């Protein structure tokens, strides 16, 4: 059986970030290089800097896209750009959208921590193609 647990979420500090549309981005796996550059220029704290930091030819084990993203995360937390919730929580959110044929839908989601299992155990199933 899956273990589903609350966790201490991290979110943008709305006292510091007043225009959320400037710091959000699509999922990392659908962002083209040109879009990543545009998002980075939108705001110095755009989330793309954490989820899709750019590799360079000079990357090393000590300085690479992942260490730069980790350093940005630490700095944003230290500077109060991001805030961590004080206690573990489950997070529920709704996504409202209209389909191409004009129907209104709300997708409700639960965000939580799940214990990892071997894929073959089929405890947690992949999220890809769940509507097919």
Regions found by a protein language model. Name each.
Residues 1-131:
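A cross-family signal for N-terminal binding/gating loops and helix N-caps
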């Amino acid at each position: 059986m899956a273990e589903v647990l609350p966790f201490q979420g991290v979110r943008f500090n709305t006292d510091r970030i007043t225009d959320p549309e400037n710091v959000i981005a699509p999922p990392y796996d659908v962002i083209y290089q040109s879009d990543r550059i545009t998002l980075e220029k939108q705001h110095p704290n755009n989330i793309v800097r954490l989820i899709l930091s750019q590799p360079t030819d000079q990357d090393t084990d000590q300085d690479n896209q992942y260490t730069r993203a980790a350093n940005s995360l630490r700095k944003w937390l230290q500077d109060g750009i991001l805030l961590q919730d004080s206690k573990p929580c489950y997070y529920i959110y709704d996504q409202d959208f209209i389909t191409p044929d004009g129907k209104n839908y709300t997708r409700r989601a639960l965000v939580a921590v799940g214990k990892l299992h071997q894929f073959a155990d089929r405890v947690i199933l992949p999220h890809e193609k769940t509507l097919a």
